[in-house]
């Protein structure tokens, strides 16, 4: 059973990527500089993901989202699978769940 605790609620706007965001998203990285977020998005897309960049204006941070789900449990399982797929990427071990608020 995936751990569904530790969900952060944020108001975000999609700035790159054509995948629509659902309620729960797996965030692989956060950047203050858009170009850095775009670099990770490009790398993830090259790995077969359809990643999205969302901007949190309150925190002035770009969130790189690996995938998005309507269901919290499915999102937590996807986050855990993402972390397990890249055990040597310490930056990915901090992947977290974002709950989109409007």
Residue ranges and their predicted role:
Residues 29:
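Conserved beta3-strand ATP-binding lysine motif
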Residues 2-22, 32-102:
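Extracytoplasmic
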């Amino acid at each position: 059973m995936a751990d569904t605790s530790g969900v952060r609620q944020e108001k975000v706007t999609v700035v790159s990527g054509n995948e629509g965001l659902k309620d729960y998203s797996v965030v692989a990285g956060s950047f203050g500089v858009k170009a850095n977020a775009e670099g990770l998005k490009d790398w993830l897309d090259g790995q077969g993901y359809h990643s999205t960049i969302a901007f949190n204006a309150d925190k002035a941070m770009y969130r790189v989202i690996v995938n998005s789900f309507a269901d919290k449990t499915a999102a937590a399982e996807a986050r855990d699978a993402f972390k397990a797929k890249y055990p040597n990427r310490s930056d990915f071990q901090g992947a977290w769940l974002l709950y989109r608020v409007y």
